[in-house]
């Protein structure tokens, strides 16, 4: 994703690395991330199903997820979806990104050998809402770093959870998608004017 993005945008590796680690962001952008993460994990928090055996485990999981999960955002939110949005509306671009991202994950799990342990429908619903979270964040902020960080938070917090209320989770995912669409559409309108 990085190489294609650099070529397409006539950029450089140095600029890509700078964007990847651009932690200096407006506080409201970080608040947006916290709102989405809070909503995404609300069913787990309310059910008391977050498992944190040691204080340092979330930090280790976050750093691991930053390297192995967050790096995906170079391809998905930094290149693929914005390129689609040059020709397609936000909703269609996000759904196309979701389909591609789903296939990528399913192939990865197949190669990894963990496909049989995945509960497919809940995983895909979570991936759909996460796709909307990340696309809204990027559309609103144009920050690769915020997408990388959010992806890493989602991956690491997901590893600290065991079960959640299915119905509450479904309602929250719908709310997340609606909120993401609202944020993205207002951002697209602002950029046009």
Language model: regions and residue ranges:
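Specific transmembrane helices
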Residues: 1-69, 139, 159-193
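Residue-level signature of the transmembrane alpha-helical core
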Residues: 34, 62, 66, 70, ...
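Aromatic-anchored segments of alpha-helical transmembrane domains
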Residues: 37-45, 98-108, 152-160
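Transmembrane alpha-helical segments that form the membrane-embedded catalytic/substrate-channel core
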Residues: 70, 74, 106-109, 129-135, ...
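Active-site His/Glu-centered metal-binding helix of metallohydrolases
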Residues: 70-75, 79-80, 84, 103, ...
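Membrane-interface helix/loop boundary segments of multi-pass membrane proteins
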Residues: 71-98, 139-143
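Interfacial helix-loop-helix junctions of multi-pass membrane proteins
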Residues: 109-121
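Functionally important transmembrane alpha-helices
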Residues: 119-174
């Amino acid at each position: 994703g990085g190489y294609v993005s650099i070529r397409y945008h006539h950029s450089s590796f140095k600029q890509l690395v700078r964007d990847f680690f651009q932690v200096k962001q407006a506080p409201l952008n970080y608040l947006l991330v916290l709102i989405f993460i809070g909503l995404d994990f609300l069913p787990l928090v309310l059910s008391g199903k977050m498992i944190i055996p040691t204080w340092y485990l979330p930090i280790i999981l976050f750093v691991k997820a930053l390297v192995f999960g967050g790096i995906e955002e170079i391809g998905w939110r930094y290149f693929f979806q914005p390129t689609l949005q040059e020709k397609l509306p936000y909703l269609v671009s996000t759904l196309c990104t979701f389909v591609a991202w789903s296939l990528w994950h399913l192939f990865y799990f197949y190669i990894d050998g963990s496909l049989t342990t995945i509960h497919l429908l809940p995983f895909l619903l979570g991936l759909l809402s996460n796709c909307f979270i990340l696309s809204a964040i990027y559309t609103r902020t144009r920050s690769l770093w915020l997408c990388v960080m959010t992806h890493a938070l989602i991956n690491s917090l997901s590893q600290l959870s065991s079960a959640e209320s299915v119905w509450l989770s479904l309602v929250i995912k719908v709310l997340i998608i609606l909120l993401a669409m609202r944020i993205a559409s207002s951002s697209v309108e602002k950029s046009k004017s």
